[in-house]
């Protein structure tokens, strides 16, 4: 499919909307009423510090809702107001935050079901309204909805759209897109649908494996088996790794994306020489400003003396997981929770998701005796009001134990 031509057709349609229905001021007011927190505002004014009895809370300099998430959530709320009687669907969670998605369900926004990675669009009818979430949607899903006569409300984060433009540029110049991301993640699925030939790499270890293959040190059968689910159809590592460009899932760890980019630049330089480097490697920065800012703030926070860390965000939130990864890498006792209810203020316990995933774990004697310093941050999909509720629970434990 000519994805650029399709996007031009879609954007000209009177059944497509990516600008919302009201002014930016109205959107900001609606979100403030729903999600902002007076307590968080006060803590920010006090240098991101709260002292309450034996408890000291330190907030990261930057955390919580980014502007892309704010825009997406506000547009989803506006959609229900603009279409009070129509059936409204959303192709996935609007963002990776359970409280926000539950609020949409209460507004009678319907979520398209998915089984084994396949969405059931049979429930969507001509004239229905369909919201595309902040992560975007695959170009194939967009075309299906457009052809069906749906009203499409596109809340895709502009930073995600920027990555789509990047991989389309790779495709135009016959470069393979090396996408740093999780191949099952909604955003990466959408991005890869706009690419031509692509390979999704989860981390630096996988990038080094591919680099070695480019330099003649790998095994073709092993390569194809390892990346069978993370590459474009018919991917041929002997042919398709001659020209590469790097892009990323916007929520990945910034430092790792940069390191992967440098690795492939060095690899292609070694393979083809400086005179031909630009013919075989294309470097474009697709790192999201908000992701970079929040990760930078987290690195600063973990440099301070902390007894423990609480990271708040959806368990399926990539950007939240990477914030937790930063704390764990510094040896800090750190807990990833998705809602305030994971903290038992009457029992001094916390139920959390370990970094490696799997089953939830419950920690006894969560806040230990004596004065204690707690660092707090949250993912880009977590409202300030949720962070406030977590702090209130910590304060109660500090008072009672």
Swiss-Prot record:
Residues the entry annotates as binding (2E)-4-hydroxy-3-methylbut-2-enyl diphosphate: 96, 185, 250, 317-319, 381
CDD domains, alphabetized: lytB_ispH (cd13944)
UniProt pathway annotation: Isoprenoid biosynthesis; dimethylallyl diphosphate biosynthesis; dimethylallyl diphosphate from (2E)-4-hydroxy-3-methylbutenyl diphosphate: step 1/1; Isoprenoid biosynthesis; isopentenyl diphosphate biosynthesis via DXP pathway; isopentenyl diphosphate from 1-deoxy-D-xylulose 5-phosphate: step 6/6
Catalytic site: 187 (proton donor)
Residues given in the record as [4Fe-4S] cluster binding sites: 66, 157, 288
Keywords linked to the UniProt accession: 4Fe-4S, Iron, Iron-sulfur, Isoprene biosynthesis, Metal-binding, Oxidoreductase
Binding residues annotated for isopentenyl diphosphate, in chain numbering: 96, 185, 317-319, 381
Pfam family, one: LYTB
Highest taxon above the source species: Bacteria
Cofactor note: Binds 1 [4Fe-4S] cluster per subunit.
Keyword Repressor among UniProt keywords: no
Cofactor(s) demanded: [4Fe-4S] cluster
Recorded catalytic activity of this chain's protein: isopentenyl diphosphate + 2 oxidized [2Fe-2S]-[ferredoxin] + H2O = (2E)-4-hydroxy-3-methylbut-2-enyl diphosphate + 2 reduced [2Fe-2S]-[ferredoxin] + 2 H(+); dimethylallyl diphosphate + 2 oxidized [2Fe-2S]-[ferredoxin] + H2O = (2E)-4-hydroxy-3-methylbut-2-enyl diphosphate + 2 reduced [2Fe-2S]-[ferredoxin] + 2 H(+)
Record: residues binding dimethylallyl diphosphate: 96, 185, 317-319, 381
Top enzyme category: oxidoreductase
Single biological process term from Gene Ontology: dimethylallyl diphosphate biosynthetic process
Family, as annotated: Belongs to the IspH family.
Function: Catalyzes the conversion of 1-hydroxy-2-methyl-2-(E)-butenyl 4-diphosphate (HMBPP) into a mixture of isopentenyl diphosphate (IPP) and dimethylallyl diphosphate (DMAPP). Acts in the terminal step of the DOXP/MEP pathway for isoprenoid precursor biosynthesis.
Protein name: 4-hydroxy-3-methylbut-2-enyl diphosphate reductase
Protein source organism: Prochlorococcus marinus (strain NATL2A)
């Amino acid at each position: 499919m000519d994805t650029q031509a399709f996007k031009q057709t879609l954007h000209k349609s009177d059944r497509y909307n990516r600008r919302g229905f009201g002014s930016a001021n109205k959107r900001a007011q609606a979100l403030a009423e729903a999600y902002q927190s007076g307590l968080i505002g006060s803590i920010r004014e006090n240098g991101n510090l709260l002292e309450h009895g034996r408890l000291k809370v330190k907030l990261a300099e930057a955390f919580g809702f980014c502007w892309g998430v704010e825009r997406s959530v506000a547009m989803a709320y506006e959609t229900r107001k603009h279409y009070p009687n129509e059936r409204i669907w959303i192709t996935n969670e609007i963002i990776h935050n359970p409280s926000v998605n539950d609020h949409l369900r209460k507004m009678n926004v319907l979520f398209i079901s998915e089984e084994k990675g396949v969405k059931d669009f049979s429930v969507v009818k001509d004239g229905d309204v369909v919201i595309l979430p902040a992560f975007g949607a695959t170009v194939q899903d967009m075309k299906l909805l457009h052809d069906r006569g749906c009203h499409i409300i596109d809340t895709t984060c502009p930073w995600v759209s920027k990555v789509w433009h990047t991989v389309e540029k790779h495709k135009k110049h016959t470069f393979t897109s090396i996408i740093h991301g999780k191949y099952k993640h909604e955003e990466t699925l959408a991005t890869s649908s706009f690419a031509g030939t692509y390979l999704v790499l989860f981390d630096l270890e996988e990038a080094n494996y591919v680099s070695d293959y480019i330099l003649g040190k790998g095994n073709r059968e092993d390569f194809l088996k390892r990346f069978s689910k993370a590459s474009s159809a018919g991917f041929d590592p002997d042919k398709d790794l001659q020209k590469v460009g790097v892009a990323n899932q916007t929520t990945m760890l910034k430092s790792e994306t940069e390191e992967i980019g440098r690795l492939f630049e060095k690899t292609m330089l070694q393979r083809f020489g400086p005179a031909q480097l630009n013919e075989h490697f294309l470097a474009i920065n697709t790192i999201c400003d908000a992701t970079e800012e929040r990760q930078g703030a987290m690195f600063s926070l973990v440099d301070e003396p902390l007894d423990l860390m609480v990271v708040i965000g959806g368990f399926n939130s990539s950007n939240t997981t990477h914030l937790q990864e930063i704390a764990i890498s510094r040896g800090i006792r750190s807990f990833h929770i998705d809602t305030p209810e994971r903290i038992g203020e009457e029992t001094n316990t916390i139920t959390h998701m370990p970094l490696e995933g799997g089953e939830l774990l419950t920690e006894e004697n969560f806040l230990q005796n004596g004065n204690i310093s707690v660092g707090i941050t949250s993912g880009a999909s977590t409202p300030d009001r949720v962070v406030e509720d977590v702090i209130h629970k910590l304060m109660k434990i500090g008072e009672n134990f």
